[in-house]
Amino acid sequence: MIAFTDIVGMDLAKQALMLLAVDPSLGGVVIPSTVGSGKSTLARAFADILPEGTPFVELPLNVTEDRLIGGVDLEATLASGQRVVQHGVLSKAHKGVLYVDSLSLLDSSAVSHIMDAMSRGAVIVEREGLSEVHPADFMLVGTYDPSDGEVRMGLLDRIGIIVPFTPVNDYRARKQIVSLVMGTRNEEDTQDELRMLRGIIGAAREQLHHVSITNEQIKGLIQTAISLGVEGNRVDIFAIRAALANAALGQRTEVDDEDLKLAVKLVLVPRATRMPEREPSEEEMQQEEPPPPEEQPEQEGEDENAPPDETDSDADEEQEETPDMIEELMMDAIETDLPENILNISLASKKKAKSGSRGEALNNKRGRFVRSQPGEIKSGKVALIPTLISAAPWQAARKAEKAKKGIKTGALVISTDDVKIKRFRDKSGTLFIFMVDASGSMALNRMRQAKGAVASLLQNAYVHRDQVSLISFRGKQAQVLLPPSQSVDRAKRELDVLPTGGGTPLASALLTGWETAKQARTKGITQIMFVMITDGRGNIPLAAAVDPAAAKAPKEELEKEVEALALSIQSDGIASIVVDTQMNYLSRGEAPKLAQKLGGRYFYLPNAKAEQIVEAALS
């Protein structure tokens, strides 16, 4: 295994891990990078520089809930005749490191448990008559490939440092990596270097208590966070702690500018939602400096020491640039009157939806244990306590019967009729597939409001930690802009730059959405909803994607395609919302008909009020 000191390049990521080793209150380090970049090797090598005896626990992606948080050890309990508690992975990482490779692929239920443990510093185990609290105060180190999806925002909020980096492409560095892997390395030299590095980190931990940061430096970090569009006081605290830890590594007693720069680079910039405008250079300021104003006579009673009037400069700073024609076509999203709970209402009103809380379903494999039921051992996990309770009344009779036959028995005689299988409630998640009509007719109608509608619904999905997918349809076919993901911010960015123009391939949108839904179901997502933002005026057939000559199809053929797909989607149990963006005087009822074919809810966007939409959804 390659040691931490042997790893070539990745200096910023190594520095980040060293800061975490100095101050575990930074929460953790997340390293997003492409496959083969060495991120996982570096993360596992982090254990080399930690104090001796520090737990380093790797979490498998397929971890079950009882393995994650703990529960009753079935084998040990049956062997001893007394209940034996088994600690989960989270509590085993207490006072150490929990490492997760492919963090973005981790099950949402497991992510929720990790978030809860990081907030509490403990794991609460309540299952099968067991109620215990296990300490679980750990650092989280995660690596993932951004192409696999994004990491849940709630989890990133609890982690101080995010270090995206690209693979090493420098010739000398790559040659050094090959030589290291293929050649031999003096083990004594490696161990000496690791001991030295552990000593530096140990000294930095002691020095951390003696490092100070000024109010002006704290103010500068907070102002930088605001200018970058970074929200939340927790991030400000992480940035301050990162600066203090870096100063401690340098054995300094005061934070300097380099410490502040590193904190901004590791904590604030990866979370930036906007970039501040560049300050003009001195030359540019001299070129743009206006001529001096003509002298004016002093006003009576004017105070010579009064501060200059800042009204004009403030007004100049608040002026906004007028967008050009291209920016107008891009149409930034704006607020609309769609109610925030439209998604909840429509899911609740869908008759085919399962009962229970949003996005939750019962199963025999994973989630939160809610009850037991009779079943075979091979069909699920045995519910120990209910099984023992079921078997208890028959023990005397069964042992007597076995004794008559000369069969020796153990402490318990359990038959297949006694076996109870666990039933879990798993928040498998709701997937909202947004299909936005970006055709030319939409550009002339209500594209601005349409984008605003999607933006408000995306925010609702973010609050409930649902997954979203974004599909646009224009020209000859639909296009998946964002596969199913929990990254609402990425969906908003794709939406902001969505161009318009061309035909309306409505059938292609339905087919693409349906295929996306079917793929999601193979990954355990049970509730899916289509949200179609369109005027419903489809005019491009499916065949046009491969044969441009087929674009001019009869209207009847287009309607048959849409109707067949809509009926298939409806029969597949997928809920739908159709938001009509067409002007009243242009409408021929295309969008209401589409909603009817899908068996979904219909909303008219331009003049709709929240109360009207809620009333329509509940009727």
Curated annotation (Swiss-Prot):
One Pfam family it belongs to: VWA_2
Pathway: Porphyrin-containing compound metabolism; bacteriochlorophyll biosynthesis
Cited Gene3D superfamilies: Magnesium chelatase subunit I, C-Terminal domain, P-loop containing nucleotide triphosphate hydrolases, von Willebrand factor, type A domain
Amino acids binding ATP: S33, T34, V35, G36, S37, G38, K39, S40
Keyword Ligase in annotation: yes
SMART domains in alphabetical order: AAA (SM00382), VWA (SM00327)
Domain VWFA, chain residue ranges per copy: 431-619
Catalysed conversion reaction: protoporphyrin IX + Mg(2+) + ATP + H2O = Mg-protoporphyrin IX + ADP + phosphate + 3 H(+)
Acidic residues composition-biased segments: 280-321
EC assignment: 6.6.1.1
Enzyme class: ligase
Annotated spans, Disordered: 273-321
Entry superkingdom: Bacteria
Keywords, comma-separated and alphabetical: ATP-binding, Bacteriochlorophyll biosynthesis, Chlorophyll biosynthesis, Ligase, Nucleotide-binding, Photosynthesis
GO function terms (MF aspect): ATP binding; ATP hydrolysis activity; magnesium chelatase activity
Any one GO biological process: photosynthesis
Family of the protein in this entry: Belongs to the Mg-chelatase subunits D/I family.
Function: Involved in bacteriochlorophyll biosynthesis; introduces a magnesium ion into protoporphyrin IX to yield Mg-protoporphyrin IX.
Protein name as catalogued: Magnesium-chelatase 67 kDa subunit
